[in-house]
Amino acid sequence: MMPFDIRVGQGYDVHALVPGRKLILGGVEIPHDRGLLGHSDADALLHAVTDALFGAAALGDIGRHFPDTDAQFAGADSRALLREAARRVREAGYEIGNVDATVIAQAPKLAPHIGAMVANLAEDLAIARGRCNVKAKTNEKLGFEGRQEGIVAQAAVLLWRASVADAQD
């Protein structure tokens, strides 16, 4: 029997880029001529991290907890949803080890905003900045990301619990 219950979760989200919406990634408003379409603020990065948290803790997915059919989540701040997801994961007995995320977007350039995204993740998850990582990639002008039709985010998280005896069956 392992002395620790270690869990890894993977999250994914994609949203279309459309005119008339703000572009918000990692809780940062990024200047761009289009934004992401969605029921909430459509922050694909935070949605991927939220999904990874729920998955690692075997708590389902973001749609189960914050359904896009529920009017209370219309226009929701994804940072608030992420904080609530972290609370539920901790309530289930887990601590957040680290987060590694990738945003795939041909444009705009995200590198100038990575530091603010990492700071928001660390604050919302109540973990050190050194345990959060965000990478920005292009899709080399291939696929819908390369044509600037949408943005994809992927995330991996590690959770741990000090005793497997506490694990839910």
From Swiss-Prot:
Keyword annotations of the record: Isoprene biosynthesis, Lyase, Metal-binding
E.C. code: 4.6.1.12
One GO term (biological process): terpenoid biosynthetic process
Cofactor: a divalent metal cation
Cleavable signal peptide: none
Record's keyword annotation contains Lyase: yes
SUBUNIT field: Homotrimer.
Name this protein carries in UniProt: 2-C-methyl-D-erythritol 2,4-cyclodiphosphate synthase
Gene this protein is translated from: ispF
